[in-house]
UniProtKB/Swiss-Prot annotation:
Keyword hit for Hydrolase: yes
Alphabetic keyword roster: Hydrolase, Nucleus, Protease, Thiol protease, Transcription, Transcription regulation, Ubl conjugation pathway
Molecular-function GO terms, alphabetical: cysteine-type deubiquitinase activity
EC number: 3.4.19.12
The protein's name in its UniProt record: Putative ataxin-3 homolog
Keyword field contains NADP: no
Originating species: Oryza sativa subsp. japonica
Polar residues composition bias: residue spans: 299-327
């Protein structure tokens, strides 16, 4: 398998960046390390598979097989191997790789030999979860993650490869080993035939991956801080509205229980009364806290506005006795 992995292409890596839902196309081409298939090629394979499946189901035996065939054919003319968005089934990927004499084997298959399985001895893996496909491929003796959601292939060390595959399996990913005679070289003239591919040196791939990681890290941190700030901005009115909504919900549940009668009626009435009392207490305490804050603010304002008698006397710069003497002198002058 080591010789099969030695694709030359001048030491370049072939990578395709995600376009729509064509991850299956990208997965097949990065497995082959070249733009060998387009979405139209895989669509043709899907149509052929659909026709064969319908033929097999329509020729099924009587009984359960006929019922299953009826259910299968009743789904209309829609394809069972490609969605309207361009997501292809594993059968389509298998057919595409069979063109190049490659086999797609599930890792949980006895053919893989799970007890003695060593991922470093393989050449390529296909990974699938929900609607996404991507390829892990050995090129020139080094492993790369050719996920089309990445701007460039991500290098994987041999130690990390096993841990990465185990993590994928533990997360529910379906993983398939690809075995056979891989194409050793793809003519560079075919580059851009599907409009998605690019040839990169390992250094270029490493540089692109590093730069993207540096750009994403501050953005992710900003996003986390923004969420935290938004969560702290919940006003008291929002809290009161949430409490009112909870009280209304409890009252509605209690009313439905009372309508049923029986032993639930008394319990429902008690729950309804308790929820209403709880909300009233919370609302009252909220209003009291508001009134207390307003009174405290008013007291602070009154203390600030009241003049200090000592300050007034010192500001006038006069003594009360002196003021009294001056008034008596003025009265005596008037009498004379």
């Amino acid at each position: 398998m080591e010789e099969a992995a030695a694709a030359s292409n001048g030491g370049l890596l072939y990578h395709e960046v995600q376009e729509g839902k064509l991850c299956a196309v990208h997965c097949v081409n990065t497995t082959l390390q070249g733009p060998f298939f387009s979405e139209f090629d895989l669509s043709a394979l899907a149509v052929d598979l659909d026709q064969r499946e319908r033929q097999v189901m329509s020729e099924g035996a009587a009984g359960a097989a006929t019922t299953a065939a009826g259910d299968f054919l009743a789904e209309g003319e829609g394809s069972h191997n490609v969605s309207l968005g361009g997501d292809f089934s594993i059968q389509v990927l298998q057919k595409a790789l069979e063109v190049w004499d490659l086999q797609v084997i599930p890792l949980d298959s006895p053919d893989v030999g799970s007890c003695l399985f060593d991922p470093e001895l393989e050449t390529a893996f296909i990974c699938h979860l929900q609607d996404h496909w991507f390829c892990i491929r050995k090129v020139n003796g080094e492993w790369y993650n050719f996920n089309s959601l990445y701007p460039a292939p991500e290098h994987l060390s041999k130690f990390y490869l096993s841990a990465f595959i185990d993590t994928l399996k533990g997360s529910g990913w379906s993983i398939f080993a690809v075995r056979g005679n891989f194409p050793k070289e793809c003519p560079m003239a075919t580059e851009g035939s599907n409009g998605f591919g690019q040839w990169l040196t390992p250094d270029d791939a490493r540089r692109i991956t590093s730069s993207c990681n540096q750009v994403q890290t501050p953005t992710q941190q900003a996003g986390v801080s923004l969420v935290a700030d938004q969560s702290e901005e919940m006003s008291e009115m929002d809290m009161i509205a949430a409490q009112q909504e909870e009280a209304d919900l409890n009252a509605a549940i209690a009313a439905s229980l009372m309508d049923t009668g029986g032993p639930f009626a008394n319990y429902a009435a008690h729950e309804e009364s308790r929820s209403q009392d709880a909300f009233a207490i919370e609302s009252t305490s909220g209003e009291m806290s508001k009134d207390g804050n307003l009174e405290e603010q008013g007291a602070n304002k009154s203390e600030t506005s009241e003049p200090n008698s000592d300050n007034i006397e010192s500001a006038s710069g006069s003594n009360p006795k002196q003021n009294t003497t001056s008034l008596e002198g003025k009265e005596s002058i008037k009498e004379d």
